[in-house]
Amino acid sequence: MKKIQLFTDGSCLGNPGPGGYGAVMIYNEHCKELSEGFLLTTNNRMEMLACIKALQSLTEPCEVELTTDSQYVRQGITLWIHNWKKRGWKTAAKAPVKNVDLWKALDAAQEKHKVAWHWVKGHSGHPENERCDDLARRAAENNPTQEDIGYEG
């Protein structure tokens, strides 16, 4: 299995507002960057979408070290999702899980890979995280045209 490092970040101007995601993918000496902007979304949706798009771009099963600055994403995918699924995508308070479309997509995107999820403090000088932040912010600021279909504002 190939070993890949993924770094992801999301940005939202206004929250909700225009948003974007950024991802940096490293395999051996190769580096690939992904980013995309959306008209109206939230920071959490962009954090999730960064992970989804990065994982979906892998063409074969890989061993992935995925680093995010979002505790929401890391805890959601490693801890909370198991009970959400058992409860039919409801929280402990029996409320519908927010961003369920993206949680399902993220769960499916990680399925064929062996993913180790890591958290890094945002804006702390971590080079790849800073680059992802820059990509995400620029995507949000650069007149985004994409519609976030699942966003329920």
From Swiss-Prot:
It comes from Psychromonas ingrahamii (strain DSM 17664 / CCUG 51855 / 37). Residues 1-141 form the RNase H type-1 domain. Binds 1 Mg(2+) ion per subunit. May bind a second metal ion at a regulatory site, or after substrate binding. This is Ribonuclease H. Keywords: Cytoplasm, Endonuclease, Hydrolase, Magnesium, Metal-binding, Nuclease. Its EC number is 3.1.26.4. InterPro entries: RNase_H (IPR050092), RNaseH-like_sf (IPR012337), RNaseH_domain (IPR002156), RNaseH_sf (IPR036397), RNaseHI (IPR022892). Its main location: cytoplasm. GO terms for molecular function: magnesium ion binding; nucleic acid binding; RNA-DNA hybrid ribonuclease activity. Mg(2+) 2 binds at residues 9, 133. One of its GO terms (biological process) is DNA replication, removal of RNA primer. SUPFAM superfamilies: Ribonuclease H-like (SSF53098). It is found in: Cytoplasm. Monomer. Mg(2+) 1 binds at residues 9, 47, 69. The keyword NADP does not apply. PROSITE patterns: RNASE_H_1. Belongs to the RNase H family. GO terms for cellular component: cytoplasm. The keyword Glycoprotein does not apply. The lineage of its organism: Bacteria, Pseudomonadati, Pseudomonadota, Gammaproteobacteria, Alteromonadales. Its cofactor is Mg(2+). NCBIfam families: PRK00203.1.
